[in-house]
């Protein structure tokens, strides 16, 4: 018969659950039940706590298996099926859950107290150490014994956050799920200490080079958890921050629009990749340079979010409205309605108005028909480019009706939607010019040209079956096919916009 469990701050038993490969809710290990519950759990309810949330989570038990309430807890904490979780027994049926895995949306902070007792600290564990945890066969060892194997991790975590005990500092763990969902959860203590636990507003993330990204501060309606969304992925990408990194922010401005400043700290760089990420940030200072992706041989131009190529959609002339992609507007600081100026290559200006769609992070340009027509964009499917000359309030956009002209006049490379057609057209023109020049040279030298050798009578007899008639028919067939393709693309684009709008409405309801 096992001794009864006596909770103490220095020796608390816990068990570890590896969620990878499990298709059902987790189960409390049998060995833990025998050692600490005399072989049988009498209660049908348990309480879960975590450092990521201030509330207690009620979870029902079906024998030893987690039942009702576990799904709400896992969704709120962004738990995935490849995570490794520690359940510390705090007495009775209360368990404190800590992440050893990859998907918790907040990092666990070291306590602001300077106590020498390591057991009072909330430790940060690295993703690359998860495999070592999973190989531990003893599921009911003391937390002290387990954490003694992580001394180096504790020291590293203490270094990362020893200066973050100030209430104005926020430490965040960049996880794959946070990048995938494009949001970052805000630690409840930080939000409450700085008056952000009940607010919904815009919030700026500022990097070391004073460049800002505007995100939206929102709250989960079920749990009250604060999070920032819409721009987190872009911020990490532009600053060379990868999944598994630790970022530290300082609240440098509160008020209507708070500002979080990224602290210059090596903790924002994954271990082993610090030099590579540092090079990326240095390269990003040079406009037009390219960042080489770590896991891909392709290069991504830094100015890719300044210029976009569009095809004119049927709804534009019908509604006199043109929708700007949400990511394009957000990444260029277009976050509020107001006046917008559109320029063409000749410097002619058109004043228009940006309207925000209520409840969404999307804008449309009202009264855009005039500058489209004036710049030769008149038919459905006509390509044109928009370049952001100045973002933020009262933005200035430059329109060009031809992709080729935009690339040559501004010095920016623009993606061509029909590379084969645009590449072959100049070649065909050159070949035609060469043939014309050769014929002209032969005629000037006195030699017989093809037209002088031909009999006009024979040409008139063959006219009904001339090549020009076939060319016209082929050309018309190509035009008809191209029109059908463009119409189909337009319909797909409308459906895509509807689906994006639906996703944004779901996000607005707090279903993250």
Swiss-Prot record:
Its main location: nucleus. Gene3D superfamilies: DNA-binding pseudobarrel domain. It is found in: Nucleus. One of its GO terms (cellular component) is nucleus. Residues 410-421, 432-442 have a biased composition (Basic and acidic residues). Residues 11-103, 169-265, 307-403 bind DNA. It comes from the Eukaryota. GO terms for molecular function: DNA binding. Residues 115-145 have a biased composition (Acidic residues). InterPro entries: B3_DNA-bd, DNA-bd_pseudobarrel_sf, REM_fam. The keyword Transcription applies. Residues 111-145, 408-465 are annotated as: Disordered. Keywords: DNA-binding, Nucleus, Repeat, Transcription, Transcription regulation. PANTHER family: B3 DOMAIN-CONTAINING PROTEIN REM-LIKE 3-RELATED, B3 DOMAIN-CONTAINING PROTEIN REM14-RELATED. This is Putative B3 domain-containing protein REM4. It comes from Arabidopsis thaliana (Mouse-ear cress). The gene is REM4.
């Amino acid at each position: 018969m096992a001794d009864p469990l006596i909770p103490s701050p220095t020796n608390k038993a816990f068990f570890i659950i590896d969620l990878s490969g499990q298709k059902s809710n987790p189960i409390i290990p049998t060995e833990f039940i025998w050692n600490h519950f005399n072989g049988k759990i009498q209660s049908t309810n348990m309480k879960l706590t975590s450092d990521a949330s201030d509330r207690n989570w009620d979870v029902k038990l079906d024998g030893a298996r987690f039942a009702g309430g576990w799904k709400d807890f896992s969704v709120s904490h962004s738990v995935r099926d490849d995570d490794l979780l520690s359940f510390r027994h705090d007495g009775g049926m209360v368990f404190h859950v800590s992440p050893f895995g990859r998907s918790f949306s907040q990092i666990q902070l070291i306590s602001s107290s300077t106590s020498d007792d390591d057991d009072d600290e909330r430790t940060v564990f690295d993703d690359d150490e998860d495999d070592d945890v999973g190989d531990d066969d003893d599921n009911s060892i003391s937390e002290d014994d387990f954490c003694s194997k992580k001394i180096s991790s504790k020291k590293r975590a203490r270094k990362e956050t020893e200066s973050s005990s100030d209430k104005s500092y926020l430490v965040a763990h960049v996880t794959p799920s946070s990048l995938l969902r494009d949001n970052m959860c805000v630690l409840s203590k930080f939000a409450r200490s700085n008056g952000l636990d009940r607010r919904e507003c815009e919030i700026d993330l500022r990097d070391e080079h004073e460049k800002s990204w505007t995100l939206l501060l929102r709250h989960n309606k079920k749990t009250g958890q604060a999070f920032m969304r819409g721009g987190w992925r872009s911020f990490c990408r532009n600053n060379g921050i990868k999944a598994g990194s630790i970022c530290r922010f300082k609240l440098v401005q509160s008020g209507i629009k708070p500002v979080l400043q990224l602290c210059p700290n090596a903790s924002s760089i994954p271990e082993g990749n610090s030099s590579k990420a540092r090079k990326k940030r240095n390269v990003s200072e040079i406009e037009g340079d390219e960042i080489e992706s770590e896991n891909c041989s392709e290069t991504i131009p830094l100015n890719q979010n300044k210029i976009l190529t569009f095809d004119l959609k049927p709804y534009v002339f019908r509604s006199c409205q043109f929708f700007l992609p949400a990511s394009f507007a957000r990444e260029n600081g277009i976050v509020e309605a107001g006046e917008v100026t559109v320029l063409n290559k000749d410097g002619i200006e058109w004043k228009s108005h940006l309207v925000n769609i209520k409840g969404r992070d999307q804008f449309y340009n009202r009264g855009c028909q005039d500058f489209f027509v004036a710049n030769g964009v008149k038919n459905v499917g006509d390509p044109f480019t928009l370049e952001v000359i100045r973002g933020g309030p009262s933005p200035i956009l430059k329109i060009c009706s031809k992709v080729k002209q935009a690339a040559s006049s501004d010095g920016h490379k623009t993606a061509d939607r029909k590379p084969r057609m645009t590449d072959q057209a100049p070649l065909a023109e050159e070949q035609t010019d060469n043939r014309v020049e050769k014929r002209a040279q032969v005629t000037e030298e006195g030699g017989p040209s093809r037209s002088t050798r031909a009999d006009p009578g024979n040409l008139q007899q063959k006219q009904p079956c001339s090549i020009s008639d076939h060319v016209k028919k082929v050309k018309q067939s190509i035009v008809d096919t191209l029109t059908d393709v463009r119409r189909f693309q337009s319909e797909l684009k409308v459906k895509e916009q509807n689906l994006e709008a639906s996703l944004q409405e779901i996000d607005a309801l707090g279903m993250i």
